[in-house]
């Protein structure tokens, strides 16, 4: 059973390049789905998401030759006041690198008060334009800025679509995003007992518009709370979503894997397949 972690931060999980590679290898070995270990799920592919120029440059250098590790590059709202020298030129250049499949994460974050709203909006729109120039999907960050984000995307709808990562809004908002060609991605917080709003959304929106992610090292699934989130833990989110949808894990995994390829405009020919069924080393 194969899984695509559509959003993780290897550079935030580990600065050490050896540890980054180990996290990838662990994910590709996977986790058992049941106590008897008769069923197994492996993270066959992942998207490493950057939040700033340094994050991309260092992590891309460390992992660019590893099969099935893809990258996006973008500057998150946290970088609005200090994006780096010549950031637009560098972004424009680096988006041509091999296995770079999207622009992100980009968006709006009014919770942390990065700059002011107008600064964030201008920063976001500039990167939407760059994504359009390169004909790439966008990976979206939204925190307490849902209406502004929706208004911007209505006027500047990405032609290659996008992913609203770590979804946190209601069902009505999800459908509005889906209408704009945006996939809805659920992270480990879907498994939290009190996340009833997310449970409702995940249970009811069309399966063909759903993705899963870890957002590693953040939002560790409930089964591993207290540990830093790692790509391998995405198995728990898959299992939880299967229960919400009342469907076999295997069937759901196949649908989500296909959705992930579509969201990032990848095909099976872009992947190298593995048959690793050894147990992962759980901490």
Each PLM stretch: what is its role?
Residues 1-283:
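Mid-domain alpha/beta scaffold segments of enzyme catalytic cores
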């Amino acid at each position: 059973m194969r899984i695509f972690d559509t959003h993780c931060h290897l550079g935030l999980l580990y600065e050490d390049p050896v540890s980054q590679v180990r996290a990838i290898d662990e994910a590709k070995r996977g986790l058992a789905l049941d106590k008897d270990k008769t069923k197994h799920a492996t993270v066959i592919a992942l998207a490493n998401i950057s939040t700033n120029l340094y994050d991309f440059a260092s992590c891309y250098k460390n992992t660019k030759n590893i099969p099935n590790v893809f990258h996006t590059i973008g500057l998150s709202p946290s970088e609005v006041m200090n994006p780096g020298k010549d950031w637009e030129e560098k972004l424009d250049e680096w988006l041509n690198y091999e296995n770079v499949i999207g622009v992100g994460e980009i968006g709006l974050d009014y919770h942390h008060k990065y700059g002011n709203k107008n600064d964030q909006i201008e920063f976001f729109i500039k990167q939407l334009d760059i994504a359009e120039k390169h004909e790439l999907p966008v990976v979206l960050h939204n925190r307490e800025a849902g209406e502004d984000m929706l208004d911007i995307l209505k006027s500047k709808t990405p032609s290659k679509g996008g992913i609203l990562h770590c979804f946190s809004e209601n069902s009505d908002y999800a459908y509005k995003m889906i209408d704009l060609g945006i996939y809805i991605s659920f992270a480990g917080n879907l498994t939290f007992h009190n996340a009833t709003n997310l449970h409702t959304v995940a249970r009811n929106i069309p399966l063909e518009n759903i993705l899963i992610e870890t957002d590693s090292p953040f939002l560790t699934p409930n089964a591993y709370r207290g540990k830093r989130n790692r790509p391998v833990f995405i198995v728990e989110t898959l299992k939880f979503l299967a229960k919400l949808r009342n469907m076999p894990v295997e069937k759901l995994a196949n649908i989500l894997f296909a959705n992930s390829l579509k969201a990032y405009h990848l095909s099976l020919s872009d992947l190298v397949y593995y048959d690793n069924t050894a147990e992962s080393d759980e901490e």
